[in-house]
Amino acid sequence: VQPWASLHADRVYRTDVSRVSASGARWLTAMAFGWMTGHTPRALFDNAPLRELLQAQHDAQQLQAAFDAGALRALAVTALSYTTGRHVTFYQSPHIVLPWKRSQRIAVADEIGVSHLLASSSIPFIFPAQAVQLEGNDEWFGDGTMRQMSPLSPAIHLGATRILVVGAAARQQPGWYDTVPGSGYPTLAQVAGQALASVFLDGLSADIERLQHVNAMVSRNPEIADARDGWRKIEVLVMAPSERIELIAARHVQRLPRTVRALLRPLGGTEARGAAFASYLLFEPEFTQELIDLGERDAMARRDELAAFLYGVIPDTMRAA
């Protein structure tokens, strides 16, 4: 977790005055005079620093060593092709895994590299699309959660019998809506935050419900189980944060670089109710460390359940006191 604990926004996207000002000017010009200039901005921010960060952290030899040792059976990342509209799963495995194809979804065996990681994390409008070669042609890709109707599918196709889901949407608790910050007409940042949440979070919840439904059917009717067709019981454990990420982000919005705050302020992105949108840009150590601490607390609170799921039994060293 060390890289995350010490991460700053300028290691993910450009935050200097000249770059951010130019980006804001391009968007303003495009909206006001785009019909005259014919130029359109690529994204709100330039994430060139993220490429440098990933190149420094990505170790192909270490990945191969994990495959060789049997510690990892497969790795997959997903991305949406803006070029064709298809959702693509790029996967790498030392085992024979036949690629799969569904409506608007395909899987491609490839050696996972920095370009795939950038494509999978290119948040729409915020970061630019990434070119990746597919079937001999360059296609432009964005964040893999877009149009991801079945986010558990890659793990299932790659042979998983148990899936640990680490989500970002907090578990709903009593008084949930009493803590919603702000009221009145929604700001653009508030609308954008909800729109991105619908893209990134809703598909996962629906897919988990589908998997649980299939599990119930297989349990009631064991004769329908067929691993070749995917009809098998697959255990799933969902780890969701006990606190709302946007409320944590609201406490740290002012830690964003001044240039970024200046760009977000007219959109309402520096207000508490716009914190969900700001959280996608909030790569600052105070925020990331609080998320790490939250994850550790939540994992420890469920450590017996987690250990039983991962190991089948609870190791003595992990039992709750």
Functional labels for PLM-detected ranges:
Residues 1-321:
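Patatin-like phospholipase
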